[in-house]
A protein has these predicted regions:
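Surface-exposed, gly/pro-biased binding rims or lids
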Residues: 1, 50, 58-71, 164-176, ...
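Extended, loop-rich substrate-binding clefts of extracytoplasmic carbohydrate-active enzymes
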Residues: 1-16
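Hydrophobic core residues within well-ordered beta-strands of beta-rich domains
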Residues: 8, 19-21, 188
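Beta-strand-rich interaction surfaces with strong enrichment in secreted/lumenal proteins
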Residues: 9-11, 101, 177-182
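Asparagine-centered strand-capping/turn motif at beta-strand->loop junctions
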Residues: 23-29, 154, 196
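Short, hydrophobic/aromatic beta-strand segments
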Residues: 31-37
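Active-site/ligand-binding surface loops and adjacent short beta/alpha elements
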Residues: 32, 42-137
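Active-site pocket scaffolds in enzymes
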Residues: 124-198
């Protein structure tokens, strides 16, 4: 069991063209508390088959896992089966891994995008909203990308994508990697969100 008392809140705020999610945590324990948090949003576009969506990530590293999905080591992404820096069609690959070493923009945000395919955009122009950008602030140093082909819907199982901003990788309570340690009464806050692409 987790022998600490950490008071957490999650605030969801609709903003123009998107959603901002703010996580806060306060350690109410008498001792320092280990802490990590992440979101688990799934995305599916009504305009086109999820198989045709294009996933793009500029992450530099991936956590390689064993048969139980426990990370064993960190590896460079470039040139591997996980490399999505040039965009990958969702229906062409399966992944359930944590990406890290995320490049940041001038505002300190990392970005992962899911977009309609060039073929769809060409055939249906003009298209107002072309995809979405999942952004995360510097407190979120990891993002898990999961592409199950078995997501249940009223019309059967379909391909979908989960893009999951996280402060640490899986199993961090055991490894300590990127784990937050909150002092007594320390307040921590971090944000991630989703913005429409045009």
């Amino acid at each position: 069991a987790y022998p600490f008392l950490v008071e957490t809140t999650v605030k969801y705020e609709l903003v123009e063209g998107g959603l901002t999610v703010t996580h806060t945590a306060v350690n109410r324990s008498a001792a320092k508390a280990p802490y990590g948090v992440g979101g688990h949003p799934y995305f599916k576009f009504s305009a086109d088959s999820s198989d045709n969506l294009i996933f793009t990530s500029n992450a530099k590293s991936v956590l390689i896992t064993d048969e139980r999905q426990i990370p064993t080591h960190k590896a460079p992404l470039a040139g591997t089966e996980y490399d999505s820096s040039m965009g990958r069609r969702l229906g062409d690959f399966f992944v359930d891994n944590d990406f890290t070493d995320l490049p940041r923009d001038a505002n300190g945000l990392a970005h992962t995008t899911l977009a309609l395919s060039p073929e769809y955009l060409a055939a249906n122009a003009p298209v107002e909203n072309t995809g979405l950008d999942v952004w995360q602030d510097a407190n979120f140093g990891h993002v898990v990308f999961f592409t199950p082909g078995f997501y249940p819907t009223p019309n059967g199982r379909v391909h979908t994508a989960a893009i999951e901003p996280a402060t640490c990788g899986p199993n961090a309570l055991n490894t300590g990697d990127d784990l937050l340690w909150l002092k007594t009464d320390e307040l921590w806050s971090g944000q991630w969100g989703v913005q429409l692409l045009h």
